[in-house]
């Protein structure tokens, strides 16, 4: 009550914001006569003038009044439409990193031209984001004449464009496109093998239409680019036949040691490595099999994949044992957890090991779809320097926009007062009674010539209602969200006299329903219409328009409450545009999903006891309020899920930013030799530390082990034992320096042999390929970690903290593996100029040929639901011993009291 009184005295935050913006509107209006007096050429010259002033240090905010006045005057000349004052306010809100809630029919598309023009003056690009391709193309074409008049370029970014077309689209001052396409282009750019393959510029300003749909409804669903892990089934099988021909080399200290074995096994570190004899023998076998050219080596750059298959096959045969490490079940390899002995269906080893074991056991070799890159809309749109959005319904989600994106919501007043009549909900006992009442309402509308839009929560419900209307011989149209162009056409004519249109709640957004039908759409269907034809169509439309107004305007029928009030408000908002009359009513039954969950059997029983007869409905403001409270609960839960998922994804996002930043630096740098030098010293230093611990006694050194490791991993054949025997003063530090010097000399010799430029290009290619491979594996590892992390709740651990800790360990491990693998490959591979060209060509072909799957993945609710179950589960398990008190700490480990945490659910 005190809050209400204060608001009345000092006004709400929204009122104060609008008051401040109206002062700037007065400035813009004062400039209008001055801009009207300009010739077309003088008005067009303003763009160059503003750009020059920006370069001289003026800010966009300082230019705003003049820029908006310019766009308003240009729009009047090009379209014959002048921006209303409320549209100017909307434009200012959108320029200031905020969300503008503008009701249906208030001209959001025209409003967007104001901040789009202003922000495009910087030359850094503006992205106008829509929810489907049709709207992107429509808005780009609709606004192109205005922007072209002002000297701005406009383009549209849609699926199916090649790289050069996309590059042109992004080079435009203003680019229209869908949220999916902008996101996928960002991911594709971060998978490019050369700077020329990238299409996006740095992300400057995004203006998101239907912002609630993009940033809230689709926030849980990540964009994923995936591709099948290379199909090498045949290669695995052929290599598998060769492995049993190899002979294990005995340990040097055993009596049977002869030194002519083909491989060694280190069970402690789970490694199997080819000896020098083994390498020669395997090369001979591969040449006989036709897998290796006669003059080629297994260690040449183009045969890295073949070497990988040999190593995977060797490990599968020597380190992994059936019924110990895995079992064969239903023609599949199922991993056995080494700690628990339990099978882990669905889990697969990485690095091609699983396929190698499948080849060994003769079962079907499965290819995996590997995640190559992924990002959520939450994290993609937060990459922009400036972000703004507009929608007809944002106020109910204002808290979430502020919490997640830091965006305040401003409700823009309508140009004309809203006169739509929103009637109270009618609640029936059964769905059949509800549908009978809906049919009667529709029949009444048709008889008096009033158009009606019926909103359903699912396609299934819309088809059910369509079937009933067909039986009742009531003509109608059903919106199918699959065909956006058709959808807009149907919606545009949904205001015809007595028209009945059934639509799922989200269908047709972005297209206004004009009372009496859309006369412009009718004219567009004519070829070269004459002035007389246009006048005739306009006159006919005016008659229909007046008839619909007299019948009460567009009537909205909601067949069920959505779990979000915002979606219900969107449906209502289709009626009453620009001060037109209209009405809305929701019909509910106790069998509806929302009512079934939140209105218990007791309420249904009470309704029956009150003597409700069949076909009778309850209508009371209390009922409507109770339903809205139920919706608030669901909205709160969904917000918690999205926030929880964002906290998890933020961990991956931080890592993604680091990897993509490093990758882009790598692409833009021609010489990375200094980086390679630092990495090489790090890797050798770490290996030496393993065998010669720092500041340790000589008795603790494992010099033979270090010799063998340097030789097997880095092709560095150094007589360390001989050095130590010959030089008593060769202490740890000096030995370390000598090893690093020898490694540097060997690498310098390689550079002399192949040439500086060839080696620089090869270093870059190896670094990119290794980073991409390890990043893919890291994404898979993160997925596995995320799927099981909720189980930590059972151990009274916080799953989020555990996820952060373990994912950091995985990332650190990935970076260490990257350094080691890059140094190992560069040390062992024999580089030739043709190898570099072949490797780059191989990368290009793989990128172009690999069938990629672009998915807007299913909503990732499972993680949050699992986490909630895991956290709540201890309450269930310990109930027999001790009931959790309302004021006790919640067993989930959140630190909150039980009544404020999971106690709310009960």
Curated annotation (Swiss-Prot):
Q: What is its main location?
A: membrane
Name the chain's protein. Answer: Protein translocase subunit SecA
- GO cellular component terms given for this protein: cell envelope Sec protein transport complex; cytosol; plasma membrane
**Residues given in the record as ATP binding sites:** 87, 105-109, 512
List the coiled-coil residues: none
* GO molecular function terms noted in the UniProt entry: ATP binding; metal ion binding; protein-exporting ATPase activity
The record describes its quaternary structure and partners as: Monomer and homodimer. Part of the essential Sec protein translocation apparatus which comprises SecA, SecYEG and auxiliary proteins SecDF-YajC and YidC.
Function, as annotated, reads: Part of the Sec protein translocase complex. Interacts with the SecYEG preprotein conducting channel. Has a central role in coupling the hydrolysis of ATP to the transfer of proteins into and across the cell membrane, serving both as a receptor for the preprotein-SecB complex and as an ATP-driven molecular motor driving the stepwise translocation of polypeptide chains across the membrane.
Describe cofactor binding as the record notes it.
Answer: May bind 1 zinc ion per subunit.
How is this protein positioned relative to the membrane?
Peripheral membrane protein
The ranges of region (Disordered) come to 875-897
EC assignment: the record states 7.4.2.8
Q: Which gene encodes it?
A: secA
| Localisation per UniProt entry | Cell inner membrane; Cytoplasm
Q: What family name appears in the similarity comment?
A: Belongs to the SecA family.
Q: Which PANTHER family match?
A: CHLOROPLAST PROTEIN-TRANSPORTING ATPASE, SECA INNER MEMBRANE COMPONENT OF SEC PROTEIN SECRETION SYSTEM
Give the residues the record marks as binding Zn(2+). Answer: 890, 892, 901-902
Catalysed reaction(s) here are: ATP + H2O + cellular proteinSide 1 = ADP + phosphate + cellular proteinSide 2
Domain of life according to the entry: Bacteria
């Amino acid at each position: 009550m005190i809050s209400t009184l204060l608001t009345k005295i000092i006004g709400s935050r929204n009122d104060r914001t609008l008051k401040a913006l109206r002062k700037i509107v007065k400035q813009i209006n004062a400039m209008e006569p001055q801009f009207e007096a300009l010739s077309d050429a003088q008005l067009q010259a303003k763009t160059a003038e503003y750009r020059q002033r920006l370069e001289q240090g003026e800010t966009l905010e300082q230019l705003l009044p003049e820029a908006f006045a310019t766009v308003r005057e240009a729009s009047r000349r090009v379209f014959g439409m002048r921006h209303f004052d409320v549209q100017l306010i909307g434009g200012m809100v959108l320029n200031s990193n905020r969300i503008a809630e503008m009701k249906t029919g208030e001209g959001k598309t025209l409003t967007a031209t104001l901040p789009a023009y202003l922000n495009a003056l910087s030359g850094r690009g503006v992205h106008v984001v829509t929810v489907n391709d049709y709207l992107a193309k429509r808005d780009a074409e609709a606004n192109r004449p205005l922007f072209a008049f002002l000297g701005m370029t406009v383009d549209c970014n849609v699926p199916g464009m090649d790289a050069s077309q996309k590059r042109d689209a992004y080079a435009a001052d203003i680019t229209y496109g869908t949220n999916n396409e902008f996101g996928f282009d960002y991911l594709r750019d971060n998978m490019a093998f050369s700077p020329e393959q990238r299409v996006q510029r740095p992300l400057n300003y995004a203006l998101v239409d239907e912002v609630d749909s993009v940033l809230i409804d689709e926030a849980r669903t990540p964009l994923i680019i995936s591709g099948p892990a290379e199909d090498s089934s045949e290669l695995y099988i052929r290599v598998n036949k060769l492995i049993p021909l190899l002979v294990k080399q005995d340990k040097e200290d055993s009596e049977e040691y002869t030194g002519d074995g083909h491989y060694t096994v280190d069970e402690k570190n789970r490694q199997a490595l080819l000896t020098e004899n083994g390498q020669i023998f395997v090369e001979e076998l591969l040449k006989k099999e036709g897998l290796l050219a006669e003059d080629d080596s297994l260690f040449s750059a183009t045969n890295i994949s073949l070497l990988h298959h040999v190593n995977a096959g060797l490990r599968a045969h020597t380190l992994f044992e059936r019924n110990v490490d895995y079992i064969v079940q239903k023609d599949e390899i199922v991993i056995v957890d080494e700690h628990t002995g339990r099978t882990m269906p669905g889990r697969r080893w990485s690095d091609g090991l699983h396929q190698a074991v499948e080849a060994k056991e003769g079962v079907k070799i499965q290819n995996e779809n590997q995640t190559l890159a992924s990002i959520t809309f939450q994290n993609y749109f937060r990459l922009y320097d400036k972000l703004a959005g507009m929608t007809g319904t944002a106020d109910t989600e204002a808290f979430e926009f502020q919490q997640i994106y830091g965006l305040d919501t401003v409700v823009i007043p309508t140009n004309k007062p809203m006169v739509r009549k929103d009637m109270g909900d009618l609640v029936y006992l059964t769905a059949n009674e509800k549908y009978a009442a809906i049919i009667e309402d529709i029949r009444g509308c048709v008889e008096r010539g009033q158009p009606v839009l019926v909103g359903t929560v699912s396609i299934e419900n819309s088809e059910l209602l369509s079937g009933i209307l067909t039986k009742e011989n009531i003509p109608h149209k059903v919106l199918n969200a699959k065909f956006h162009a058709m959808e807009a056409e149907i919606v545009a004519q949904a205001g015809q006299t007595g028209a009945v249109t059934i639509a799922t709640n989200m269908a047709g957004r972005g297209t206004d329903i004009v009372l009496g039908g859309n006369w412009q759409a009718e004219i567009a269907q004519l070829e070269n219409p004459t002035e007389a034809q246009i006048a005739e169509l306009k006159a006919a439309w005016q008659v229909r328009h007046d008839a619909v107004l007299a019948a009460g305007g567009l009537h909205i029928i909601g067949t069920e409450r959505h779990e979000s009030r915002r979606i219900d408000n969107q449906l209502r908002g289709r009626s009453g545009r620009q001060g037109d009359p209209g009405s809305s009513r929701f019909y509910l039954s106790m069998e509806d999903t929302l009512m079934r969950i939140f209105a218990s059997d007791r309420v249904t029983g009470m309704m029956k006891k009150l003597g409700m007869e069949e076909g009778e409905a309850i209508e009371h403001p209390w009922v409507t309020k109770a339903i809205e409270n139920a919706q608030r609960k669901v909205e709160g839960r969904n917000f918690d899920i999205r926030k929880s998922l964002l906290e998890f994804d933020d961990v991956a996002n931080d890592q993604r930013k680091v990897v993509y930043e490093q990758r882009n630096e790598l692409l833009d740098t021609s010489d990375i030799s200094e980086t390679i030098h630092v990495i090489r010293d790090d890797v050798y230093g770490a290996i030496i530390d393993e065998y010669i611990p720092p500041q340790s006694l000589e008795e603790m050194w494992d010099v033979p082990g270090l010799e063998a490791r340097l030789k097997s991993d880095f092709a560095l054949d150094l007589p360390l034992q001989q050095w130590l025997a010959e030089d008593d003063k060769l202490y740890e530090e000096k030995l370390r320096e000598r090893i690093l010097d020898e490694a540097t000399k060997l690498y310098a010799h390689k550079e002399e042999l192949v040439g500086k430029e060839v080696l620089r290009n090869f270093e870059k290619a190896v670094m990119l390929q290794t980073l991409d491979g390890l990043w893919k594996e890291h994404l898979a590892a993160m997925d596995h970690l995320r799927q099981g992390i909720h189980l930590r709740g059972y151990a009274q651990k916080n799953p989020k903290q555990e996820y952060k800790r373990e994912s950091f360990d995985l990332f650190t491990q990935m970076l260490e593996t990257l350094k080691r693998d890059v140094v190992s490959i560069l040390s062992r591979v024999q580089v030739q100029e043709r190898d570099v060209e072949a490797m780059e060509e191989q990368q290009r072909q793989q990128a172009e040929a690999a069938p990629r799957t672009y998915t807007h993945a299913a909503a990732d609710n499972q993680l949050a639901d699992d986490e909630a179950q895991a956290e709540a589960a201890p309450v269930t398990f310990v109930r027999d011993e001790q009931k959790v008190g309302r004021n006790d700490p919640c067993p989930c480990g959140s630190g909150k009291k039980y009544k404020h945490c999971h106690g709310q659910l009960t």
